A protein has these predicted regions:
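Positively charged n-region of N-terminal signal peptides that target proteins for export
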Residues: 1-4, 743
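Sec-dependent N-terminal signal peptides
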Residues: 7-13
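Solvent-exposed alpha-helical segments and adjacent loops
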Residues: 26-779
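C-terminal segment of classical bacterial N-terminal signal peptides
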Residues: 15-24
Length: 779
């Protein structure tokens, strides 16, 4: 017995020697809660010197230096939580989450979660609590105290940085109770509201990474970084046409990778950047900080350290001349999968197949039916689980000129599976498009309908359904969101204290099959122009060819930094819309060369002299003087298209001012009636700053429509003024219907005349047949 007591005491003393690795949170008896985990304290005492950069293996992997540069970031729920940023956690939907990433060349050394929440006044103290998880690891628990009920509460919880990876999810789980027995999880008294001002305070430390192109495009673009990709472009001086084209290809490729994050390409002439950047240099023209670099004998792409900061990397695009730089740029855009080492030589980039119209990777294909599997952006996008499953969303990016006016609908064949309701009730699947309800389908509880279950590897208990849906075509735009909501009538426990019914709620599972299809292949391409909304939303008409092979950009001779920045930001924005680089873009600084070209024209800086007198132009910006034509009647709503008489120019006003202004204008090309001109103009450096800000800001682009968008300090004002022209092709009968669509009275008159003529022809035909039948000898 003494031996047993000895061993028990020894084990107890040994266990007490271990530090506690469990996050502890003190009850929130004060307005501010500070939950300090033992691990966090230990981390501060022992800095993480020597931690290997995540995702990199081997003896040469970079480590965290104690004196390395760091940055402090505050991510609010308004920025990173699902809209609107606040969360209401309920008994049947107890979970809410936020997501954030970590760049490959950084590690998080400190993290603090700041919560602002209000618990329901009906909750039971202490039994109700808020659990915090990071990547499914419990970070701590915040009990709800009596003093907090119905009041705004502030809480701080340290997050262990050892659990932070390249992609992270912070999950809040609400455990709520409002009575000791016989609770209903659907009770409206079970809630906890998390405010949108809650957030994460993170300290990132930069890693001293190797110069290795095998990780390209990291660190110049990191898909784990949710911020706008700001990537300076450095030139020795004002670039000529060949170098402008090469830099535009690189910018459009980075834009295609940035996607929804946005992109910004500041331009520097013979200056050192203060962050990761792209540098263009030839043997004869190079920035001063590269003057000692050996001359190259071929197109070379090299990753080097910043001369003054080893934590900043420069991607240098070298060449003997502009032709080499153009080949190197195409190598970045199309051959980067082969990059490795500190430098690569681009021997050849040879096109094998030409691009086709409307084949942009980010657009839904219009030449055949498309499966939902092709539209997924991540693996589990088309499935959901929960007592009330979250909605399933699918994005549809369409060409802006898809003609859907007389369409009866878009064919969509949906294959879906779902957990079978236990009884026949009102459980259903609702389908919405752009927040507009389309159709609803009942979720059947009949087991005999489960015939397709054996043909596909799914869990037992799921019911298969196949449904055809017609989408109202007029509700579609260039960017669309298709939403599937599965609504279950879940049985809930309840009763009284003496007669209580309890059971364990079972999660429901719903799946939209990858083989579901949507078909846009039966429709023509036809659009009235000018339409700056098509340009602002999808880069149209330039994006019709994803490689911009039918686009000519007219630049000023010896462009300044702001004008080059406008070029790079514009092609970067178009690349983000198409998902493909502008490898075949043509750039010129001679406005006379565009005459007679079968191409869409992008003008940056100023209207060429040969076009200044064109009657189609509705606005002109030149230094301090500008003029604009205004229409007879103007509507502020982009969805309302005025008729021809309202668009007619009524006045032309000319003004002189020292204030900054920029503009985007669209008009028909004088050289081809199926081509368009988009001009991006500014009158000063501040004007170009506002223009670039508008190009990079999706919210400001959304306010552009019509033929003229004027950009001032106060915002953007758009006008529809001047003549309308049409781009695309319609059969003659569709053109007739389109012409009559805005004239219902004329359409009714023509319909009546057509009926009368048809009746007269039939009457004459019947008379002839009757005469021949009664007098066969007269044949």
């Amino acid at each position: 017995m003494k031996r047993k007591l000895f061993w028990i005491c020894a084990v107890a003393m040994g266990m007490s020697a271990f530090p506690s690795f469990m996050t502890q949170a003190t009850p929130a008896t004060q307005p501010l809660i500070n939950a300090e985990p033992a691990v966090a304290a230990q981390t501060e005492q022992n800095p993480q010197v020597g931690q290997v950069m995540l995702g990199v293996q081997g003896a040469d992997a970079p480590v965290v230096a104690q004196n390395g540069p760091s940055r402090d970031v505050k991510l609010t729920f308004a920025q990173i939580a699902p809209p609107p940023g606040s969360m209401v956690l309920r008994g049947i939907n107890p979970n809410g989450s936020i997501e954030f990433g970590m760049r490959s060349d950084e590690v998080v050394t400190k993290a603090m979660l700041n919560l602002e929440y209000t618990p329901s006044p009906s909750l039971l103290p202490v039994q109700s609590q808020l659990k915090v998880y990071l990547n499914d690891e419990l970070m701590g628990v915040l009990p709800v105290t009596k003093e907090q009920l119905g009041k705004k509460t502030l809480a701080q919880m340290p997050i262990n940085p050892l659990f932070i990876t390249d992609f992270n999810r912070v999950r809040l789980e609400f455990v709520g109770h409002y009575q000791d027995v016989c609770e209903n999880p659907a009770s409206t008294t079970l809630w906890l509201d998390v405010g949108r001002s809650s957030g994460l305070d993170l300290t990132y430390q930069t890693l001293n990474v190797k110069n290795d192109l095998s990780h390209f495009p990291v660190p110049f673009f990191d898909p784990r970084d949710n911020r706008t990709n700001t990537l300076p472009m450095v030139f020795a001086g004002a670039p000529d046409v060949g170098l402008q084209q090469a830099s535009a290809i690189v910018a459009s490729w980075f834009g295609s990778r940035s996607g929804w994050r946005g992109q910004n390409f500041p331009v520097l002439y013979n200056q050192l950047p203060d962050r990761n950047a792209i540098v263009f240099a030839t043997n004869d023209k190079r920035p001063d900080f590269l003057r000692d670099h050996p001359a190259v004998k071929a197109p070379v792409i090299e990753m080097i350290n910043h001369p003054q900061n080893p934590y900043v990397k420069l991607l240098v695009v070298f060449g003997r001349d502009d032709k080499d730089l153009l080949q190197a740029a195409k190598g970045i855009a199309q051959g980067n999968i082969l990059f490795r080492g500190e430098s690569v030589v681009v021997n050849e980039v040879k096109p094998l197949l030409p691009r086709k119209p409307y084949d942009a990777p980010n657009w839904v294909r219009t030449d055949r039916p498309v499966t939902f599997g092709e539209l997924k952006t991540y693996e589990e996008q088309l499935q959901s689980s929960g007592l009330e499953p979250a909605a399933i969303n699918v994005s549809l990016n369409l060409p802006p000129d898809l003609y859907l006016m007389r369409s009866t609908g878009i064919d969509m064949d949906i294959n879906y599976r779902y957990t079978m309701p236990p009884v026949k009730d009102s459980s259903r699947m609702d389908i919405s498009l752009n927040n507009q309800f389309l159709q609803s389908f009942n979720l059947s509880s009949k087991q005999e309908a489960n015939r397709l279950l054996l043909r596909i590897p799914v869990l037992q208990g799921l019911l298969d359904g196949k449904t055809d849906v017609s989408i109202p075509a007029l509700k579609l735009g260039a960017t669309n969101q298709l939403r599937f909501d599965f609504e279950y009538m879940n049985p809930k426990p309840g009763g009284s204290v003496d007669n209580c019914i309890t059971f364990q709620p079972v999660q429901n599972h719903v799946v939209i099959g990858d083989d579901s299809t949507i078909d846009f292949s039966k429709y023509y391409h036809f659009i009235p122009m000018p339409d700056l909304r098509a340009f602002a939303n999808a880069g149209f008409p330039f994006s019709r060819m994803a490689d911009l092979s039918q686009t000519i950009t007219v630049m000023p001779k010896a462009p300044n930094e702001a004008q080059m920045e406008t070029l790079l930001n514009t092609v970067g924005f178009i690349g983000a819309q198409t998902g493909f680089p502008a490898i075949n873009l043509t750039v010129t600084d001679d406005g006379s060369t565009i005459q007679g070209k079968d191409a869409d024209i992008m003008i940056i800086g100023g209207i060429p002299d040969k076009l200044k007198d064109d009657k189609q132009i509705d606005l002109l910006v030149q230094a301090t003087e500008s003029w604009v034509k205004t229409p007879m009647r103007q509507t502020p709503f982009p969805g309302i298209v005025p008729d021809e008489s309202d668009r007619a120019a009524e006045t032309r006003s000319t003004l002189t001012s020292s204030g900054a202004m920029a503009a985007v204008i669209g008009f028909q090309s004088p050289y081809n009636d199926q081509r368009s001109v988009i001009a991006l103009l500014a009158d000063s450096p501040r004007g170009y700053e506002m223009l670039n800000d508008a190009v990079n800001d999706s919210g400001k682009r959304a306010t552009m429509f019509g033929s003229v968008a004027v950009i001032r300090e106060s915002g953007i004002n758009s006008l529809r003024v001047g003549d309308v022209y049409y781009v695309g092709h319609l059969p003659w009968f569709e053109r007739v219907w389109y012409a009559l669509a805005n004239h219902p009275i004329l359409l009714a008159v023509l319909a009546a005349i057509s009926v009368i003529l048809l009746a007269w022809v039939l009457w004459r035909l019947l008379r002839i047949i009757s005469r021949r039948r009664l007098n066969p000898d007269n044949e």
